[in-house]
């Protein structure tokens, strides 16, 4: 990415870390505020950042283990308290830190009796253990435990269902993302007779990177996704598209009848919490008791449904309807017969 090619917007945003704390070696928390956004912008950024944090930020995990004299994952070894399955689960939860994209090899070679922890893993210099006290196994007698490990860096979640071979090799479900959770909320305020918004971002990480570093990486990932659109009007890009024969004739003749706009809204509403409706306490608490946490949850109900809820009177229904209409231009159906 070339910084000079990106025009600097007139609107100047500022950010601030409001709260930062370590709740443990494997749980770091950060809360950030970004403002001022024009009305509607904070929601756009909040949805994108949350999805990028949860799905694009990379992490390092153990993806493979090989034991001696083991047939299947539910085997037990004499002198070891845990089953192979339990040990694999413990290995899966080990928090690692590495900047290398190469597949790394590691191992455990321990003589009991003793507790085996993450600190006992023999690692390459490019990999670091975040919490050396994480439990792996308990050796109760004077026997060795030898395990070969494989470490990889990626994003998201890789499901392999703990498949094993006859030689004691196990491919582990890997949770690569270092993000434990990510939320956002939006608050409006008035500035120079204009409505402006503050975006609050909350990030929890596993300790392999700070919440601030996670936000930076998620931002870079989003920039990489969108930067291609900056040059779409340039003649060079058009020629390149023509040379690659990327035109409408190359697409399948079958028309796509899916309402893309509707699908996009449905996805977005699943990420928008009802806090952003800024409802009075009575209406808000009633919705929470109904397990309504997002706008998507709320849209499963009609006005008639809400009126039947205990302590949810006509006034509360009106407040919900007004908030949905004002903030998201959504008309909550009066009853099931008016649902489009």
Curated annotation (Swiss-Prot):
Protein name (record): DNA-directed RNA polymerase subunit alpha
Domain of life of the organism encoding this protein: Eukaryota
Sequence segments annotated as region (Alpha C-terminal domain (alpha-CTD)): 264-340
EC number assigned by the record: 2.7.7.6
Compartments, record wording: Plastid, Chloroplast
Broad class of where this protein is predominantly found: plastid
Region Alpha N-terminal domain (alpha-NTD), annotated ranges: 1-233
GO terms classed as biological process: DNA-templated transcription
The reaction(s) this protein catalyses: RNA(n) + a ribonucleoside 5'-triphosphate = RNA(n+1) + diphosphate
SMART domains given in the database record: RPOLD
GO MF term list: DNA binding; DNA-directed RNA polymerase activity; protein dimerization activity
Record's keyword annotation contains Plastid: yes
Annotated keywords: Chloroplast, DNA-directed RNA polymerase, Nucleotidyltransferase, Plastid, Transcription, Transferase
NCBIfam families to which the protein is assigned, alphabetical: rpoA
Subunit structure: In plastids the minimal PEP RNA polymerase catalytic core is composed of four subunits: alpha, beta, beta', and beta''. When a (nuclear-encoded) sigma factor is associated with the core the holoenzyme is formed, which can initiate transcription.
Domain notes: The N-terminal domain is essential for RNAP assembly and basal transcription, whereas the C-terminal domain is involved in interaction with transcriptional regulators and with upstream promoter elements.
Source species of the chain: Psilotum nudum
């Amino acid at each position: 990415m070339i910084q000079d090619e990106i025009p600097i917007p007139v609107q100047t945003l500022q950010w601030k870390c409001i709260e930062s704390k370590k709740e443990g070696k494997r749980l770091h928390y950060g809360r950030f505020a970004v403002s001022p956004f024009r009305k509607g912008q904070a929601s756009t950024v909040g949805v994108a950042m949350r999805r990028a944090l949860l799905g694009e930020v990379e992490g390092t995990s153990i993806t493979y283990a090989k034991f001696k004299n083991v047939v299947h994952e539910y085997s037990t070894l004499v002198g070891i308290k845990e089953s192979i399955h339990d040990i694999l689960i413990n290995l899966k939860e080990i928090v690692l830190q590495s900047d290398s994209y190469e597949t790394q090899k590691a191992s455990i070679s321990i003589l009991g009796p003793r507790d085996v922890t993450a600190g006992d893993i023999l690692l390459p210099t490019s990999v670091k253990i975040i919490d050396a006290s994480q439990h792996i196994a308990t050796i109760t007698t004077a026997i060795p435990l030898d395990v070969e490990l494989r470490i990889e860096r990626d994003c998201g979640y890789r499901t392999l269902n703990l498949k094993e071979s006859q030689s004691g090799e196990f491919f582990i479900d890997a949770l690569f993302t270092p993000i434990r959770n990510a939320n956002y909320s939006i608050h409006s305020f008035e500035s120079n007779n204009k409505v402006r918004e503050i975006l609050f971002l909350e990030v929890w990480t596993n300790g392999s990177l700070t919440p601030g570093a996670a936000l930076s990486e998620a931002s870079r990932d989003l920039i990489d996704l969108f930067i291609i659109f900056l040059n779409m009007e340039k003649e060079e890009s058009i020629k390149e598209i023509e040379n690659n024969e990327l035109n409408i004739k190359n697409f399948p003749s079958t028309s796509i009848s899916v309402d893309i706009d509707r699908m996009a809204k449905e996805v977005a509403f699943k990420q928008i919490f009802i806090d952003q409706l800024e409802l009075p306490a009575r209406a808000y608490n009633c919705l929470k008791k109904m397990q309504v946490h997002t706008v998507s949850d709320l849209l499963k109900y009609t006005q008639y449904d809400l009126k039947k809820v205990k302590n949810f009177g006509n006034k509360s229904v009106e407040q919900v309807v007004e908030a949905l209409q004002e903030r998201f231009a959504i008309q909550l159906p009066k009853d099931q017969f008016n649902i489009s």
